Amino acid sequence: MKFVRINESDISSERLNGETIIISFSNGSYYNAAGTAADLLFLISKQIHPEMWSEILAKAFSGYGEDSDHITVFIEKGLSEGILKLTDEESLIRKVIDLPNDTVRNNWIEPKLDKYEDFQDLLMVDPIHDTTEEGWPKLNDE
């Protein structure tokens, strides 16, 4: 298993009602991680060692553990999108924690990271140098 952490230098994220919205400053995309994906990102953000995830997730979701490849695929996607980055094992905490009490959890489903690119042009704009005198979001034609 790869050891990962949130790539805080390139993204901003916020969790609300069991969903995490992520904005990438490096590519202008934004992402939605709901349910199981939001909970995995929560565990990663708290730097919980992956050895602890099974106990935490099995307590929260029925059917967890039937397909462990889901987590590997999710982590690979997060790495390829620049949302996650590799870290060393020593920086991770071996502790069982509670997941946020902001959603109802039922069955384990494959964690998905939905990517959206419809605001890339606006998110990648330098508001000082790339806009007209009228300001953002009025872009220079250059």
Residue ranges and their predicted role:
Residues 1-26:
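Long, low-complexity, charged/polar intrinsically disordered regions in eukaryotic proteins
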Residues 29-142:
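Long, charge-rich, low-complexity alpha-helical segments
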